[in-house]
Amino acid sequence: MHQDHLLSTTQLSREDIETILDRAAAIEMNPDGWEAQYSGTVLGLCFFEPSTRTRMSFDAAMKRLGGRTIDMGSVDNSSISKGETLADTVRVIAGYADAIVLRHPSEGAAKLAAEFVDIPVINAGDGAGQHPTQTLLDLYTMRENVGLDEITVGIAGDLKYGRTVHSLAAALSNFDVRQHFISPESLQLPRNIRYDLHDSGSQVREHTDIESILPELDVLYVTRIQRERFPDENEYQRVAGQYRVDTDILSHADNNLTVMHPLPRVDEIAPEVDTTEHAAYFEQAHNGVPVRMALLDALIGRAK
């Protein structure tokens, strides 16, 4: 990996992705061998939006590498509540930390932050834009279950506002993957992303129902409807609950189908699916630690 920051999956080549995933696999096989690798290193956690998995797995990843974390805490308890700008906030934190993990409600925030600091910035979600570290653990999970070439992936739910979808679709274009996008018409993949996928030569099809395409899929990637991104609550209510994966629907799927979800789920996947062989979303969340350890090693190690 040759970049100073990770802002978008569009900056990653297949080689970049495979290098990080290979390193994550090595870490998972020998997690104890990394404990003193980054003694004295500090990772700044700057979350302007709620987070459970991303925040905690980055915290665990840095500590398992032998480093420490400092957490900005909630926006209400920081100087942002007094009107401090993002640029000023990251400039200050860059004086305390060796890298910054940033989540922000505004698309493009991570790219902006990277312009003001000379330490690595990792985009942990920028509004409806990108979530590249989620994609890396998604790809790791896919590779462990079905591989990353000659597979068919269905991505269902909120494709318009879902940043995990935007990142994943771009990254999958580096591999031999047939991508099927399943959503209500009002939540289709943004036009610019569709154009980019076609320009990359990706095999892409769009659908409005899951059942018709389910038998063809190796992976079904389900996402929640991003209620917090909707400008109109009525629009959200019209599309909420349209896609729900349960054991009845999965009876139409191949026995080897892998069901994934970036979490948190609301009601997109019934709890009864959790105990089936299809469910991989908790494995997916678990993979966040070794993958983010590998990413921190790639970025901070290079910066040092």
UniProtKB/Swiss-Prot annotation:
Gene3D superfamilies listed in its UniProt record: Aspartate/ornithine carbamoyltransferase
The entry's keywords: Pyrimidine biosynthesis, Transferase
EC number of this enzyme: 2.1.3.2
Class of enzymatic activity (EC top level): transferase
PROSITE patterns: CARBAMOYLTRANSFERASE
Source organism superkingdom: Archaea
Residues bound to carbamoyl phosphate: 53-54, 103, 131, 134, 263-264
Function: Catalyzes the condensation of carbamoyl phosphate and aspartate to form carbamoyl aspartate and inorganic phosphate, the committed step in the de novo pyrimidine nucleotide biosynthesis pathway.
Family listed: Belongs to the aspartate/ornithine carbamoyltransferase superfamily. ATCase family.
NCBIfam families the record matches: asp_carb_tr (TIGR00670), PRK00856.1 (NF002032)
Official protein name in the record: Aspartate carbamoyltransferase catalytic subunit
